[in-house]
Amino acid sequence: MNPANYLILSALLFTIGTVGVLVRRNAIVVFMSIELMLNAVNLTLVTFSRINGTLDGQVMAFFVMVVAAAEVVIGLAIILSIFRTRRSASVDDVNLLKY
């Protein structure tokens, strides 16, 4: 398959993730959209690594996946805290955590 197809797919996935972050108000959906954007970046890194014939992009994608795993743990803990205090996972309720 042509590497340009992977880059187009990556751009499409990143665009879908960006629209999800900007449009949705549910924290879980926003969180999933951010993960989709990270996976699009990983696909781009692996594609450019394949084009250049080096492993640099694949190593970087691995580190992005490790950081994303830590982000999942912390992000879900924050979302769970918001849900327990407000009984809603809305992004609009985040500024109310201080009360």
Swiss-Prot record:
NCBIfam families per UniProt: PRK05715.1-2, PRK05715.1-3, PRK05715.1-5
A GO molecular-function descriptor: quinone binding
HAMAP family xrefs: NDH1_NuoK
Natural source organism: Frankia alni (strain DSM 45986 / CECT 9034 / ACN14a)
Signal sequence extent: none
Protein name: NADH-quinone oxidoreductase subunit K
Record text on subunit structure and interactions: NDH-1 is composed of 14 different subunits. Subunits NuoA, H, J, K, L, M, N constitute the membrane sector of the complex.
Family per record: Belongs to the complex I subunit 4L family.
